[in-house]
Amino acid sequence: MLTVDYDRLELRPGHLILDMGCGAGRHAFESFRNGARVIALDYSFDELAGCNDMFRAMRAAGEVGDDAEALPVRGDALHLPFADDTFDRIIASEVMEHLHDDARAISELARVLKPGGTIAVTVPAWLPEKVCWSLSAEYHAPLSEGGHVRIYTEAQLRERMEAAGLTPAGSHRAHALHSPYWWLRCAVGPTNGNHPLVKAYHKVLVWDMVEAPFVTRFTERMLNPVLGKSVVVYGTKPEPTTAGTTKGRRARVAA
């Protein structure tokens, strides 16, 4: 299940991409399949070990080309262990809502992105997230350890990116079918994954992800603008001019 649209990201073979807060690795794996050189960064040893196992399995199964590379790296989002202007592409998917100092984290991403490079930042969309917070205090911080600490509007996310020196461009919503699932989870208790209704809905989501039937794909596309669980904002880092100032590069991503 991908949140980022790789056509908009314009990832190319050989690009060096950072998946910051990679978690279980879904975007890192897709980037690896696309022939990129992938840095999968997370703070969790367990998540990184799982990613490393999958990278090896993908290589052994011949899913990736000889030039594709992938490396799990443990690191702190507020102090990225990379030099300035390192990455061609960056993905930060469902990370910022967990960080108290999100401004520092986005500034770090801007620092390590190459001038002219593209970044995709995804966070839970305002309406679905607001419903979750209203239904259950256990869904978010402080009752949920490591849980969500804020609710973003798209405008607020764009402001954070601009403040870090990035140029926000196109955006879209994703995963509308997942919003009711999380509302249901919050209604019965976020930790109650064995509730019959939760289990039944989860089976539908798994079926949709595996089979991708037309009816659910079409329905989700229609619902995404309103109920999409995640909002994705793409942006670029301005390129320096010969005069030493900067100029914005219009992002080559669809609006």
Predicted regions and their residues:
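A structural motif corresponding to the C-terminal end of an alpha-helix
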Residues: 160-166, 237
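Residues that recognize and position ribonucleotide moieties
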Residues: 70, 150, 225
